[in-house]
Amino acid sequence: MKQLIQCMGMLMLLFELSSRVSAQITLVKDGKATSRIVLVEKNEVNEQAATLLQDFVKRISQATLPIVADTKARSGDILIGGKQASAGEDGFLLKTTANEQLQISSGGDKGAIYGVVSLLEQYMGVSYFAKEAYTLTPMQTITLPAIHREETPAFRYRQTYSYNNDDPVYKLWFRLEEPKDMFIENMWVHTFNRILPSDRFGKEHPEYYSFINGEHRPGHNSQWCLTNPKVFDAAVRQLDSIFKAHPDMKMISVSQNDGNNTNCSCPACKEVDEYEGSPSGNLIRFLNKLAERFPDKEFSTLAYLYSMQPPKHVKPLSNVNIMLCDIDCKREVPLTDNASGRDFVKALEGWSKISDNIFVWDYGINFDNIVSPFPNFHILQKNIQLFKKNHVTM
């Protein structure tokens, strides 16, 4: 009798599981909406996700799924909202429930939107390429299979420099999360001359700027004398004003001006450079002092050209971000497969040993002719896997 009860229990469990797996949801039948989009929580992201789904379902079928909130969900509805604990930031879970509803829950930030994009791509056959350039198959009936799909982006920030970036749908479709949006306005890379403009400070305080060939040289492409305590004090005053003008923003770039080998070579700076084995040592020491002065802010700096290699001794504090640049590398082969790339890889591996707060600015371009076609799809995955292995977050 006990064995019979166990057997019956197993059969009931298998029946329940099979019914869940086979559950389908029909959104549109014969050109008429049979489902609703239910906002579990009303907020800007969920509403944007719902509108995107409604828009493309209408493009496919000419039917409009109603968007509702503050109502009890029923069988066949799509539920947008709710927290998915196992998904990371911008992650999501698409899950068909036992009562034939599709739940789109989020790990945070834009997770619900990216869940809708995945639903449209993977289960409705929509491909989006550029502004108003997309493909889909018109259907009078849209039926979804049972779904269980969870994703979290491998990188916190994802950015491409593309003419399509001004299209909001393109940015959502390709899950682009612009780090630039996190920074205080106009304080995004090469900021030394914006924080302490040489036109304003250079004449009275040339000692703030790089000592090159026997004299301090203020200028748009000059750097700071980072061992001069007066430079730190002046930078703190400027930054304090900037932070007060942008109280809701926490991230700023304090980074070298564009140009190579323009760093300060005064005796004090030179001594630090030699001890640290790289001019980046002076930068990180300076940034760490700023990070201690403003512990609630995050400071980004460049590891670029002369500062690409990491320091031997000093380590960035947790609120100091390293933006590592591979500008000197060849790009027709993966970074690991050429000498210039291997020099960058050495720098990347060195930084990853002392920081887990690293961005990579990857120049997927041919500088010899920037407007000519430059096939690089075959190298992207290997490079991206290299970045992920070394704690890169963008």
PLM features: residue spans?
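Bacterial Sec-dependent N-terminal signal peptides
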Residues: 1-26
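Extracellular/periplasmic catalytic domains that process cell-envelope and extracellular macromolecules
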Residues: 30-31, 72, 95-98, 246-247, ...
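Feature activates predominantly on carbohydrate-active enzymes
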Residues: 34, 42-52, 56, 85-285, ...
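Surface-exposed patches in mature extracellular/periplasmic domains of secreted proteins
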Residues: 62-70, 131-132, 251
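Short, well-ordered secondary-structure micro-motifs within conserved domains or adaptor modules
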Residues: 66-90
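Substrate-binding cleft/loops of secretory-pathway carbohydrate-active enzymes
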Residues: 300-331, 371-379
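Glycoside hydrolase catalytic-domain groove-lining segments
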Residues: 311-317, 324-366, 383
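Substrate-binding cleft of secreted/luminal carbohydrate-active enzymes
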Residues: 369, 375-394
